[in-house]
Each structure stands twice: as C-alpha cells, then as structure tokens.
Design a protein with these regions (language model features):
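Conserved GNAT acetyl-CoA-binding A-motif
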Residues: 120-129
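Short glycine-rich loop/turn motifs that provide flexible caps or phosphate-binding loops at active sites
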Residues: 77, 92, 103-108, 127
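GNAT-family acyltransferases
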Residues: 1-99, 112
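Conserved acetyl-CoA-binding loop-helix of GNAT-fold acetyltransferases
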Residues: 102-119
Length: 132
C-alpha cells in the first residue's frame, strides 16, 4: 500500500514479497557497515515484516518500517525506519541498497518522510542517528 510519493520515489508498506530483497541488500557488508546490525538473515526480514503488519503510527510509542521503490516499480531499493520517541517526536533512519547510492534517493526519501510525518500525523520534532 502506498504511504506517500516524492518526485522519483514511492514509499509503501513492506510485505512478504519483500523478504528476499530485504535480505539481499541488508546483508551486504557495504550497506550493513552503517547500520546497527552485522549480519541480516531471512529470519530477521520475516520478523520485520510481521512487526510492520502489527504496528500503526501513533503519538505514544512504536516503530514502523516503510519500503522505498522508484515510481512505477515494486522493486525495493531501500527502506525507511520511524520510531516514536515521545509525543510529537520521532527518530528516523534509512537503509539503501548500495547500487542506488549517490543518486539523492536517501535525501529525497528522508525529506518526504519528514513532510509526511508533519503534515499527516502532526509530528514536529525529529531525531536522527548516524552510524560511522
């Protein structure tokens, strides 16, 4: 299901059809280097999809993962993470397949997410973590 669109991207819910693709790019060393995990497995992807189906965005707590695709395609190029930290406050993160790096997709997805969270859900404070 589409959540929102940007000029070049569609941000959508994740589902079982995304499991193999999540494992494919999230298990790359170049991608996981900047994430909180070292090894990403099929079991991790199944658990993530299950959690996404049980979670809704509210102002109290919880987290959600969204898929990133280019417009007109269902092929996952990455994903966005939203975690509710406090009322009107959320943190964000994203993972992008390294073959799509250096095209501005991460920036475009994050800017779209910031607008979506503010305009659709009334959030006004965002926290981002950087893994080096």
């Amino acid at each position: 299901m589409k959540i929102f669109e940007t000029d070049r991207l569609t941000i959508r819910t994740l589902d079982e059809d995304d499991i193999d693709r999540l494992v494919e790019y999230r298990s790359k060393k170049t991608v996981s280097k900047y994430q909180s995990w070292n090894r990403y497995t099929r079991r991790d992807a199944v658990k993530l999809i299950k959690k996404c189906k049980e979670t809704v965005i509210d102002h109290k707590k919880g987290s959600m993962q969204f898929g990133i695709t280019t417009k007109g395609s269902q092929h996952l190029i990455g994903d966005l993470h939203v975690e509710i930290m406090a009322p009107h406050t959320f943190s964000i993160g994203y993972t992008l397949d390294d073959v799509f790096w250096n095209n501005g997709f991460g920036t475009e997805a994050v800017l779209g997410l910031l607008s979506y969270m503010h305009e659709e859900h009334g959030f006004f404070k965002c926290i981002a973590y950087i893994y080096k």
